[in-house]
């Protein structure tokens, strides 16, 4: 199941669904639902159950809580509306989704729940009082859920740093300048001529290095979803190229 919020993402979701079905021989479903609303997570689970329970049996094996927003402002500029939006999507959304999905999790510890946190929960990036706080809450919930759901699923979080995509592109020059020192000293964020895209190599001259590729972060998610990760729960697994070695 692929969740998206805005109608503008419908075609992208459809294209991704077709690609996954063709490549892996699986069934997919795109569901439009706003996880930042009280009813959104429950509606999402209901839609998935209706679509995939034609045989009578229904089970949710893997959940990746990836929805998130980042609204960066220093203390004097923080607005209550920004706080509410961020915590509704980043904190309340995952909680309500797990609440709605819990009845359908396995009963043999084989389930996998992966929460997307951020290095911001630990690094104290300037301008991320709200975002960093929301991701720290996600890490706290990860540990709680690991205990409450111990007979149903493992629950872990990963904490990426900058990742190539729309959220990274939306960062201001001021914010990028503020994290440049971190990037310069992150081992795997060094841009490589002839390996990384030319525009990333060029951007690294001012930003300090390149962001992670989505595939690099997804690989760690996949690892935690595997049977080999069955003895790992309640952990925050680094997925940031070594950025938190500075912490």
Mark where each language-model region is.
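Short C-terminal tail/terminal secondary-structure segment
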Residues: 123, 210, 221-222, 232-247
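Conserved mid-core segment of classical short-chain dehydrogenase/reductases
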Residues: 42, 53, 59-62, 70-84, ...
């Amino acid at each position: 199941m692929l969740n998206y919020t805005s109608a503008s993402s419908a075609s992208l979701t459809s294209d991704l669904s077709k690609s996954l079905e063709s490549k892996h021989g699986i069934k997919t479903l795109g569901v439009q639902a706003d996880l930042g609303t009280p009813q959104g997570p429950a509606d999402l689970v209901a839609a998935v159950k209706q679509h995939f329970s034609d045989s009578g049996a229904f089970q949710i094996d893997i959940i990746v809580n990836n929805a998130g927003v980042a609204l960066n402002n220093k203390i004097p500029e923080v607005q209550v509306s920004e706080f509410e939006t961020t915590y509704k999507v980043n904190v309340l959304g995952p909680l309500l989704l797990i609440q709605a999905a819990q009845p359908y999790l396995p009963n043999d510890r084989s389930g996998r729940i992966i929460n997307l946190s951020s290095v911001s929960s630990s690094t104290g990036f300037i301008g991320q009082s709200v975002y960093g706080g929301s991701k720290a809450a996600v890490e706290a919930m990860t540990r709680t859920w690991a205990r409450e759901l111990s007979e149903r699923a493992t629950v872990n979080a990963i904490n990426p740093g900058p990742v190539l995509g729309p959220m990274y592109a939306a960062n201001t020059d001021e914010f990028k300048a503020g994290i440049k020192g971190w990037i310069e000293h992150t081992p795997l964020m060094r841009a490589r001529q002839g390996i990384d895209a030319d525009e990333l190599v060029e951007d690294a001259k001012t930003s300090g290095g390149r962001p992670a590729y989505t595939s690099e972060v997804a690989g760690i998610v996949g690892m935690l979803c595997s049977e080999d990760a069955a003895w790992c729960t309640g952990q925050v697994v680094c997925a940031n190229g070594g950025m938190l070695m500075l912490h």
